[in-house]
């Protein structure tokens, strides 16, 4: 019985950790979803549409970039900046010093804008949903994405 409990704890720990295999999978699937050019705009639109459908009040956090119209040039530029930052974080998952520097910078930017802690899990859920929809549910590993995205978001949210 003790062995079973220890095994269950190890499985739970491994699932919560962004392992090297998780990082490889997330990087590959992110590259597929992020793509280039208009693919990036489509991925961004999927993320923001999902986020705002689930958290309509979040639009107010983006008034500076015309958050009421995700198709506006101001919001599209913001969306591409967010995806660019996420792209750098995903690319740096296996380079801890670089990732930590990126996360520290993103943390200071988000702190100065007063982004509430409640918004981060919603963004993670929307980003994961958008990537899954883009790469296909059959090959998508939700545990890998959750563990690696939580590592990124915990660094941004402090």
Curated annotation (Swiss-Prot):
Matches recorded under InterPro entries: Erythrocruorin (IPR002336), Globin (IPR000971), Globin-like_sf (IPR009050), Globin/Proto (IPR012292), Haemoglobin_extracell (IPR014610), Mb-like_M (IPR044399)
Binding sites annotated in the UniProt record for hydrogen sulfide: 89
UniProt GO molecular function: heme binding; iron ion binding; oxygen binding; oxygen carrier activity
Location in or out of the cell: Secreted
Gene3D superfamilies: Globins
Family according to the record: Belongs to the globin family.
Name of the protein: Extracellular giant hemoglobin major globin subunit A2
Organism whose genome encodes this protein: Oligobrachia mashikoi (Beard worm)
């Amino acid at each position: 019985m003790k062995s079973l409990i220890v095994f269950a704890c190890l499985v739970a720990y491994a699932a919560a950790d962004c392992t090297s295999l998780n990082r490889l999978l997330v990087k590959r699937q992110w590259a597929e979803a992020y793509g280039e050019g208009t693919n990036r705009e489509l991925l961004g639109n999927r993320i923001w549409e999902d986020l705002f459908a689930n958290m309509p009040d979040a639009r107010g956090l983006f008034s500076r970039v015309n958050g009421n119209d995700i198709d506006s040039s101001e919001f599209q530029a913001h969306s591409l900046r967010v995806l660019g930052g996420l792209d750098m974080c995903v690319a740096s998952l296996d380079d801890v010093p670089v990732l930590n520097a990126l996360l520290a910078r993103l943390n200071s930017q988000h702190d100065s804008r007063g982004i509430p802690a409640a918004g981060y899990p919603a963004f993670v859920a929307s980003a994961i949903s958008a990537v899954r929809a883009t790469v296909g549910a059959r090959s998508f590993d939700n545990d890998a994405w959750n563990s690696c995205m939580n590592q990124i978001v915990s660094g941004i949210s402090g």
